[in-house]
């Protein structure tokens, strides 16, 4: 069990959007199961899975695909690489995103040559840091003279590449054909890409998505890597709540790869090479590790025909993507984190639980609903009853390899987070000693079914 008292963690915009997408998708699946909406499942010859749901409410199709790879599939020293693909997969193909593909390839090759030399200089700087000769390898004043020369060469190559690039062409093709909502997100366990297209543009979606899987070109790789690093700096490094959230997470998970942030550690992101990205892509973006999902105004047979025509062009991967071998160790002691920030006092308590699909996960979902919402026990007990909190919540989060249960609340002005903590434990003890009344349980079940 883990017990923490920390300020409430605020998610970044992209994390919130990703969470919303997941919520909408999971809500739809729950409704589909409850209403027995038929989901057609097909498997292409290359191992790719196709899920189809026919709905003729509107003349549109929500199309997406999931690569079953996230930050938990990374290795130490390469954290953030899964999230980087969320950016790189929009850079185009040999026919999308460039005016001169051959010139583009020549510039990319020249960039890699310069970067190889820069990495050699960076190894020297890390050795200088290890010996105490410099205090920070990232500071401009600590760069070696040769590294600075190479950086100038690389900047010139970037300028040359801009002359042959067609910026955001992938997005323009979609929007020019009536598509909307094109986006992507990365979590610990998956990376998803999605957009909405008019029903009569489904074949275009099939071509566009299969083309970027079959012929991806990772243009502006290092510039985009720097964008990701800046994204991390703005959302994590520059905000105390972001830093606390990262510390919170890394303390909770001791041995499992959930320990590191999805965006990656600050020293890892600048060290990711294009060669590493190419290898990662070859392993985890193979057809047998991808699921296509189409929901909307479609005919399953026609959609399957399109999928075979376009996606079966992609050869099956040579290797099976490995599972995550490291499991979370059993933790024997309570951990507590106290942090000060410019926010209302809050208490959060987390327990290690079970992963998605585990037989106990459903009972924990129900428990979360019993405790949460404005009709739940925590709100009634802590907000309306003892009035130590202005809000209170509970939730079970089941991830692919492990899960956690969270109870928390925001302290009312003049009250302490310790009082919120005590109130939460009081409600938990009641659940341990008394059965949940049938009427209360039935009300919660209706939420799901």
Segments and roles (model prediction):
Residues 233-235, 249-250, 319-377:
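His/Glu-based metal-binding/catalytic segments typifying zinc-dependent metallopeptidases
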Residues 53, 58-74, 80-82, 97-211, ...:
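M16 family metallopeptidases and their MPP-like homologs
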Residues 10-18:
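Short Gly/Ser/Thr- and charged-rich N-terminal loops/segments
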Residues 79-91:
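Active-site recognition of the HExxH zinc-binding catalytic motif
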Residues 18-31:
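Bacterial N-terminal signal peptides
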Residues 218, 225-226, 233, 245, ...:
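Non-catalytic, conformational "gating/processing" segments within enzyme and secreted inhibitor domains
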Residues 35-42:
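Cleaved targeting-peptide boundary
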């Amino acid at each position: 069990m883990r017990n923490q008292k920390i300020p409430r963690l605020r998610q970044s915009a992209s994390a919130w959007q990703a969470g919303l997408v997941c919520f909408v998708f999971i809500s739809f699946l729950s409704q589909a199961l409850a209403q027995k909406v038929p989901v057609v499942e097909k498997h292409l010859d290359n191992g790719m899975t196709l899920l189809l749901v026919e709905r003729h409410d509107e003349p549109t199709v929500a199309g997406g695909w999931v690569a079953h790879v996230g930050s938990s599939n990374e290795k130490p020293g390469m954290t953030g690489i899964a999230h980087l693909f969320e950016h790189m997969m929009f850079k185009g193909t040999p026919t999308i995103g460039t005016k001169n593909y051959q010139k583009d390839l020549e510039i990319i090759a020249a960039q890699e040559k310069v970067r190889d030399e820069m990495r050699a200089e960076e190894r020297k700087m890390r050795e200088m840091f290890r010996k105490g000769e410099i205090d920070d390898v990232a500071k401009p004043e600590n760069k070696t003279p040769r590294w600075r020369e190479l950086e100038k060469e690389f900047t010139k190559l970037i300028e040359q590449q801009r002359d042959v690039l067609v910026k955001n062409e992938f997005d323009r093709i979609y929007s020019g054909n009536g598509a909307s909502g094109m986006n992507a997100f990365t979590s610990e366990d998956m990376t998803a890409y999605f957009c909405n297209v008019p029903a009569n543009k489904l074949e275009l979606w099939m071509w566009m998505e299969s083309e970027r899987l079959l012929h991806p070109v990772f243009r502006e790789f290092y510039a985009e890597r720097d964008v990701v690093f800046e994204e991390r700096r703005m959302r994590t490094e520059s905000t105390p709540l972001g830093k606390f959230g990262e510390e919170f997470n890394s303390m909770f998970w001791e041995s499992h790869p959930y320990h590191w942030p999805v965006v990656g550690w600050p020293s890892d992101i600048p060290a990711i090479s294009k060669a590493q990205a190419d290898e990662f892509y070859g392993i985890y973006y193979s057809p047998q590790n991808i699921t296509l999902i189409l929901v909307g105004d479609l005919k399953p047979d026609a959609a399957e025909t399109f999928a075979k025509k376009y996606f079966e062009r992609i050869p099956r991967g040579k290797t099976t993507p490995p599972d995550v071998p490291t499991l979370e160790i059993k933790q024997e002691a309570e951990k507590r984190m106290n942090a000060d920030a410019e926010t209302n006092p809050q208490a959060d308590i987390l327990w290690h639980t079970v992963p998605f699909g585990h037989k106990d996960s459903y009972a924990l979902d129900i428990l979360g609903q019993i405790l949460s919402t404005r009709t739940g026990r925590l709100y009634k007990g802590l907000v309306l009853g003892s009035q130590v909190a202005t809000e209170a919540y509970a939730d079970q989060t089941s991830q692919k390899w492990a899960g956690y249960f969270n109870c928390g609340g925001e302290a009312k002005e003049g009250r302490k987070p310790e009082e919120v903590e005590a109130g939460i434990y009081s409600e938990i003890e009641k659940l341990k000693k008394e059965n949940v009344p049938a009427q209360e349980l039935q009300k919660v079940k209706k939420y799901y079914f």
